[in-house]
Amino acid sequence: MRLRQMTLMKTRLAFAAVAALALAAPALAQTARPATVIAASSALVTLEGAERAQALAAINAELNSIQRLQGRFVQTGPDGSRAAGDFYLQRPGRLRFEYDAPATMLIVSDGSVVAMRDTALRTTERTPLRSTPLSLILGERIDLERNARIIRVSREGGWTLVTARDRSGQTDGTITLQFNGGELRSWDVVDATGARTRITLSNVTRPASLDRGLFRLPDVVSTGRRR
């Protein structure tokens, strides 16, 4: 029973982390480098007024330029545990996150529903896309200022950091996106308890097309990895 509870807790943590991954994924530009994380420091300058608006406009433009993405991700949990996998994204509305073994999770959005399949627990959790953070960035038009509550926009050297929270107030915690040269490199999610989950990226490309079968819900197709 204890093992099952621990597995369930990790599964739900993964779902939250992937929701955060999806929140940021459309901003990815092509890069083969893993993410670099900036620690908070006195060198961070908070942007205000015209500078803030200009930075957000540039990020929104990059977000809206994306049609399809695929690449690798590494998720680091609050306890230091790590999981990696492949992700696929096609706007509007479609996502797929495949975790490498020994993780047993598959998360798919088909444009209307987000489903998480855990093969170890033999469970599938579903929720409407519109009720998740994914709906904020998978539509035809992305506007971070409108879709989320921006807490802070800051800069250090060539890095721009955007910290945001759910505008509706239904989800506690914050996400900090870290951009360099217009490309998203990493982000941290901090929940209501202060627990931090980090996502880093590598081998991100913009394919000309993706197999639509990647975005079928896991109850319909095999949860095995598709190539």
What are these regions (language model features)?
Residues R2-A16:
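Bacterial N-terminal signal peptides that target proteins for export
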Residues A61-P78:
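A short, Trp-centered hydrophobic/proline-enriched beta-strand micro-motif
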Residues N64-R68, R82-A84, Q90-R94, A101-P102, ...:
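Extracytoplasmic
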Residues A14-A24:
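Bacterial N-terminal signal peptides
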Residues R146-N147, R155-R227:
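Gly/Pro-enriched, hydrophobic low-complexity segments
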Residues L121-T160, A164-R167:
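Flexible, surface-exposed loop/linker segments and immediately adjacent secondary-structure boundaries
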Residues D86-L136, R198:
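An acidic-aromatic
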Residues M9, P26-A58, N64, G213, ...:
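Compositionally biased, proline/threonine/alanine/serine-rich low-complexity intrinsically disordered stretches
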